[in-house]
Amino acid sequence: MRPEESAREKIDELLSLAGWSVQDLERFNLKSSLGVAIREFPIESGYADYALFVDGKLVGLSEAKPEGMTLSGVAEQTERYSSSIPEKFHIKGENVRFLYESTGVETFFRDKKDPSPRSRRVFAFHRPETLKE
């Protein structure tokens, strides 16, 4: 198993523990749970590793990286991906608000509505009800 595949397995488990229903793009159901995490979600510039939907609305993205990778540099990639979300998924004319980078061992998070948004380490993914607007 490649290191990134191992990280994705751990991230799937972390998302599930936080109350997310982790689903594949080919057979997802946004109504199956308050929070749905879709793997390999298409965006204008490629694919986001995870798209996080709460109540059917796209609220966040998460990028998966192999264990041992420094996540601080990945924040720029996640930011770029958040800027290439198709407009039909924008909420109130705004782009995705919550961004994560994770190795499955270490997870960073930022809220783009913070006055000075910056990534910070968190111990777990937020629960869907916490991210509900």
Name what the model sees in each region:
Residues M1-E133:
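Accessory nucleic-acid engagement/destabilization modules that flank
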